[in-house]
Amino acid sequence: MKVLFVASECAPFVKTGGLADVIGAVPKALAPLGVEARVMLPLYPALRVLSEGGKTVWSSDNLHGGAARLLDVRAEGLDLLLLDAPHLFDRGGNIYLDADGTDWPDNPLRFGALSWVAADIAANGAAGWQPEIVHAHDWQAGLVPAYLHQMDAPKPPCVLTIHNIAFQGLFSPDLMAPLGLDAALYTQDGMEFYGNLGFLKAGLAFADKITTVSPTYAREIMQPEFGMGLEGLLRARARDVSGILNGIDTDVWNPETDPALPKSYSLKGLKAKQQSRQAVLERFGLTPPDNAPLFCVISRLTTQKGVDVLLDVVPDLVARGAGLAVLGSGDRDLEAAFVAAAHRFPGAVGVIIGYDEDLSHLMQGGSDAILIPSRFEPCGLTQLYGLRYGTIPVVARTGGLADTIIDANEAALAATCATGVQFAPVTPDALSHAIDRCCDLFAERKTWSGMMRCAMRHPVGWETSSKAYLEVYDRLLGG
């Protein structure tokens, strides 16, 4: 089976969030199941080195104002189709934002181009390769199903995966014609969204199947609280919607082989985790006592992630003698508030604004628990990394967090299957209580050790989820 993945980012080449990790991992997980996958993404400056020796399999003299070509490249175990359109993608800043943190004004043309080329390849093939399934991801590839829908030629079915419904790609309807979209598609049942052209809505309206990244999130987004205005469309298409949990790349995230850790460790020998703990303490300038847990946060600093609620309970956490290491960036006000907390509680709270992949690995290896107080979380990956490294997740009971973490209640502790601490609602009182529970569990060393071992045994790879994706593909092909 041949499958074309279409996305705006892919690890390890270019990454701004969990989407990249998924796109970098799923094709590899599907390969043993007989799926021949290729990943189409833009050729950003960071990927330019990959283009050397790439084979041109498609070209155009004018793709939204400039020449473009599609390069067939193999790198890091992935078959890539890189859209080389320098006028659209060869620029500094973030892949979505300029140096000032503002959306590139031509983002609809940039990702509309990606979607159009993907649809063209889906319908017509390239260099003898043509997909049987197209799998588009998030709003950046949301127009792929729409372009396929308006084609008269035979074309493969399309799956759209929602990684975060909060990001919808809303633009002026004046772009319909420049994007080559049929005006008849701009309806309430199509891609119109409160007077805007909705890229994600277009995908939801015209994809043959819709998936999202956890069963709980699939149910949540059909309700007004989480659906961001798209809940009605999703309820109407409920039979076509399924939730498939994300996994992680267990080769990349492996405490037995992770080069970012000062010393590897495993279920057979957890003592070496203490060396990573000491390294984290030194990096963040922390001095909590050995009998108190070291909490970490590795997150975008936004209200969606609930870190504003965490700020309210930092004094309670410090009063318990615990330490807190924070790595992340996001809203400037929240960044400043965390830096202020570090100044207020020296030795107890350490903050590094930004993102560092190696440091995130070290923090997973060296922390005792990871705090994830998200108001909503489609799936979440950091809690899965925590499980893999025996770093106990303390999570809000929502989305994929609810699906992947077994709360340390009396029944779960008695059955020796607890892997973390859940709490709800996302309020300072509930989070403070969850932190208290975690500290109490940490004090019971035998109980804590058992939770660590349960966490590390918990399956977090792609084996089950890749089979679920294959089932979706098979159903579309009549299998």
Curated annotation (Swiss-Prot):
Pathway: Glycan biosynthesis; glycogen biosynthesis. Keywords: Glycogen biosynthesis, Glycosyltransferase, Transferase. InterPro entries: Glyco_trans_1, GS/SS, Starch_synth_cat_dom. GO terms for molecular function: alpha-1,4-glucan glucosyltransferase (ADP-glucose donor) activity; alpha-1,4-glucan glucosyltransferase (UDP-glucose donor) activity. It comes from the Bacteria. SUPFAM superfamilies: UDP-Glycosyltransferase/glycogen phosphorylase (SSF53756). Coiled coil: none annotated. It catalyses: [(1->4)-alpha-D-glucosyl](n) + ADP-alpha-D-glucose = [(1->4)-alpha-D-glucosyl](n+1) + ADP + H(+). Its EC number is 2.4.1.21. GO terms for biological process: glycogen biosynthetic process. GO terms for cellular component: cytosol. Gene3D superfamilies: Glycogen Phosphorylase B. ADP-alpha-D-glucose binds at K15. Belongs to the glycosyltransferase 1 family. Bacterial/plant glycogen synthase subfamily. HAMAP family: Glycogen_synth. Synthesizes alpha-1,4-glucan chains using ADP-glucose. This is Glycogen synthase. It comes from Roseobacter denitrificans (strain ATCC 33942 / OCh 114) (Erythrobacter sp. (strain OCh 114)). The gene is glgA.
